[in-house]
Amino acid sequence: LSLEVKGLYAGYNGSLVVQGIDAIFSKGRVNIILGPNGSGKSTLLKTMAKVLQPKVGTIRLFNKDLQNLSLKEIAKLIAYLPQRSNSVPRMTVFETILLGRKPYFTFGPGNRDLEIVNSIIEELKLKGFENKFVDELSGGELQKVLLARCLAQTPKVLLLDEPINHLDPKNQIEILEVIKKTTYRVNLITLLVLHDLNLALRYGDELFFMKDGKLLWKGFASELTSEVIEMVFEVEGELAEFSNQRLFIISSYTTPSEKRFPKAL
């Protein structure tokens, strides 16, 4: 059971940002998408969340075409967290997380909805924040609340676009730990966009590298080579091991004219 993208082209107006993507994202794994700015990572996630319609190609979840599913069905299956926005409605933490249960409401929230929200508040260590307004929270606290809202949907797929952007190292680690543990515990299909290679190596099971709208490399984190990183990001360096953790150490910058890039997958 998986999320499968086949021959996908997507973009805005007449511009194609994602070009010919073929990929399978499996359950129970943290799948991390990496690539330079403007490589199509966010557009890919938006298309998989059905925020953006594909120009060509298909997206199938558990062998069902997303195009044939209603928005309510999508909301029960897929939770999508876009890049951080400065405009957050003035609601309490509890109300914000409860919004994740809205696809399941009949005549407002029931006992089951409240139980799920309270459980997630405990899990993400947000106890004591329930009655605070979200616009009064720190960046790390707000990201936890927005992640909690996604988890409240009890989705099968979690799509997170740069969920640790602008956060300090402690909050980055806390949020990534929650994502990884929840993915394994609930057997989620998790996709997240990251820019930090070393955090991707630490938390990713499978990595997907994009450049210029195309998928250039995919594989397990343990299979990644420095040549792939150099090809995608145009920086030279080495993969080293420290305390059982693989790290990429940059040695120099490579201009595009100095490298020859292979074709996309």
Task: Report the location of each language-model feature.
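Conserved ABC transporter NBD signature motif
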Residues: G57-D65
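Conserved ABC ATPase signature
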Residues: F133-L137, E141
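Conserved ABC ATPase "signature" region
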Residues: R112-F129, T154
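The feature captures the beta-strand-to-loop junction immediately N-terminal to the Walker
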Residues: L34-P36
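Catalytic Walker B motif of ABC-type/P-loop ATPase nucleotide-binding domains
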Residues: L158-E162
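ABC ATPase nucleotide-binding domains
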Residues: S222, S226, V232-L265
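Helix-to-loop junction immediately C-terminal to a conserved catalytic motif
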Residues: A49
